[in-house]
Curated annotation (Swiss-Prot):
Pfam families: Toxin_cobra-type. Expressed by the venom gland. Transmembrane segments: none annotated. This is Cytotoxin SP15a. GO terms for biological process: killing of cells of another organism. Keywords: Cardiotoxin, Cytolysis, Disulfide bond, Membrane, Secreted, Target cell membrane, Target membrane, Toxin. Shows cytolytic activity on many different cells by forming pore in lipid membranes. In vivo, increases heart rate or kills the animal by cardiac arrest. In addition, it binds to heparin with high affinity, interacts with Kv channel-interacting protein 1 (KCNIP1) in a calcium-independent manner, and binds to integrin alpha-V/beta-3 (ITGAV/ITGB3) with moderate affinity. One of its GO terms (molecular function) is toxin activity. It comes from the Eukaryota. Monomer in solution; Homodimer and oligomer in the presence of negatively charged lipids forming a pore with a size ranging between 20 and 30 Angstroms. One of its GO terms (cellular component) is other organism cell membrane. Disulfide bonds join C3-C21, C14-C38, C42-C53, C54-C59.
Amino acid sequence: LKCKKLVPLFSKTCPPGKNLCYKMFMVATPKVPVKRGCIDVCPKSSLLVKYVCCNTDKCN
């Protein structure tokens, strides 16, 4: 699995066990990602921070 990094032109291969791509952004600025990469379990979103996870690189 390859997930995009914070710089959109680059991607990285996920290590074993981390089989989800994720994107984290502030709810106030949904167009500006704060973090993106590979993760094992999708974190819960909060009032300030939202996570988008999926098993391809399309979501992040």
